[in-house]
Amino acid sequence: MSLDCTSHIALGAASPAPEETYDHLSEVPVTREQLNHYRNVAQNARSELAATLVKFECAQSELQDLRSKMLSKEVSCQELKAEMESYKENNARKSSLLTSLRDRVQELEEESAALSTSKIRTEITAHAAIKENQELKKKVVELNEKLQKCSKENEENKKQVSKNCRKHEEFLTQLRDCLDPDERNDKASDEDLILKLRDLRKENEFVKGQIVILEETINVHEMEAKASRETIMRLASEVNREQKKAASCTEEKEKLNQDLLSAVEAKEALEREVKIFQERLLAGQQVWDASKQEVSLLKKSSSELEKSLKASQDAVTTSQSQYFSFREKIAALLRGRLSMTGSTEDTILEKIREMDSREESRDRMVSQLEAQISELVEQLGKESGFHQKALQRAQKAENMLETLQGQLTHLEAELVSGGVLRDNLNFEKQKYLKFLDQLSQKMKLDQMAAELGFDMRLDVVLARTEQLVRLESNAVIENKTIAHNLQRKLKTQKERLESKELHMSLLRQKIAQLEEEKQARTALVVERDNAHLTIRNLQKKVERLQKELNTCRDLHTELKAKLADTNELKIKTLEQTKAIEDLNKSRDQLEKMKEKAEKKLMSVKSELDTTEHEAKENKERARNMIEVVTSEMKTLKKSLEEAEKREKQLADFREVVSQMLGLNVTSLALPDYEIIKCLERLVHSHQHHFVTCACLKDVTTGQERHPQGHLQLLH
């Protein structure tokens, strides 16, 4: 009784005022039943006290026996106290073990975090190695292309050497034929012949310079075409890689969603178990000795629920930030390319509808321009065929790397030999120029007079003038035809250049789109990492809750053991009451002790009143704690429901945007970056529509002007 009184007094000191607690009595029916039970117990105790007053009159004779028995009971109580102290020591040891185990758990968590960081570092190094391998493969492909170019240049140089040799031989034969005089003319003078020869030489040099310039322009255009093909190859490979990355990202996102669903289900199951355990704790409050421990457990659970509340609030804030960031991205896209004020959902939907209407009008305009674009599409089809062939060659080139390395040395030797041949050709060109100078010197009349004589000089001059006039007319006609052909080639190459420039502008737009897609994918990777971190935190929380459940179960078993001990004590009290009934037979001896017994009974009544008051205060305190826990659970549920509502709003917004863009929502799970990509395409098409129309108009006007130029040249 003394231990119970002290515990009740301690609980009463920490309990709140009765004015605050009586308001909640109507809400908790269990406490009313307990109060009725305690009142019935008090009434029974009072009736028993009245009976004992009558019995004490007959129990004075057996007081000495009772005192002896009380001494024995005091000895047993001291033994029980010693056992209680031993139990307290064991509890202290177990608490120290629990603290050490918690420290070990924290160390293990730190080790797991270190392992996760090491795994992330290894993954980063693996990605870097993969990127290096890809760059090396690109370098190998470029070296193969350079080898092919070198081999082609060597073959072209050989062909040019053979052609130059043939031309040189033909020129020598033509000069020999020209030097043979066939016809005569008496009108031309020596000075006229010299002037005509000089004019012919100047015209030949001018035409040669034009031919060299045209050949250089042709080579430059060919190199640009090759570079554009190489860029197309690289862009196609990058597109394939990025498509694979996008597929992997979608798969990982689905896995993360599944993990989140499983974590939410586990959390709900844990909440159910926590509720069941709270009900068990409420049932275990009938034991007075375990009330302090239950209150401490409730405080711990409330602190942990506050932590979970904070975590759920953080999750809600993250979901809100994701929703606002997604909406702000769309608003920023529409702001950057269109004049837009505000970033609400209604304004965004209105802008998207306006863009759809504009696109419909643009489609009508495009249907009119498709006839003009068909010619350009044919050229693009040819380039796509070249592109496919180049892809096949690239696949074959990876297998032929080892063989090409052996051929590299051979081709380098051939390059050296080609350089030697170029030097020889330059030397032969110099000889050829010297030979022409010598011919011009030999065409003088003094040398011809010295060789053939003075009499044959006029005949030789007339014959040469006639031959030179014929050759001059033939050369002029040939030069005109060559110049006309070169001008045609220049015009065709200019048209090709314009088409290639348009193609290059389209490719640059594609590159910009790909860069934006990369940025979106990096954002997705960051979101995936954040989701991984949240999942890990949830797993840690689940583990902690499971540990706490285990501890609560252990405490429940301990409480059951204590209940068994209390039952044993009740049995002992029943035995004592039987002994008291036996002692009541000796009432006559205890008449002298009535007054003392009455005083003791009054003190017992006061103690009972105090115990009842303390029990009420403890019950009210427990009710307050339960109400706090229930309010926290309600706030948690409300926050979760708000998060679910916001997720539904996000999903509805995505569905509306995707339906307006014409995407299939029901077939497959659409990622956010595809919707953003479609919006960016709409904005790009809105910006570049007028530019493309202007370019097409320029092309059509150029095509209308070119045939007029051809007619002028023919005239």
From Swiss-Prot:
Lineage, uppermost ranks: Eukaryota, Metazoa, Chordata, Craniata, Vertebrata
Subunit structure: Binds Golgi-associated microtubules.
GO biological-process terms attached to the record: microtubule cytoskeleton organization
A GO molecular function held by the record: microtubule binding
Coiled-coil ranges (or none): 30-286, 360-418, 478-656
Main location group: Golgi
Record's protein name: Coiled-coil domain-containing protein 170
Function: Plays a role in Golgi-associated microtubules organization and stabilization.
Organism from which the protein derives: Homo sapiens
Cellular localization per UniProt: Golgi apparatus
Key words, A-Z: Coiled coil, Golgi apparatus
GO cellular component: cell junction; ciliary basal body; Golgi apparatus
Superkingdom per UniProt: Eukaryota
Annotated region described as Required for binding to microtubules and Golgi apparatus location, given as residue ranges: 355-591
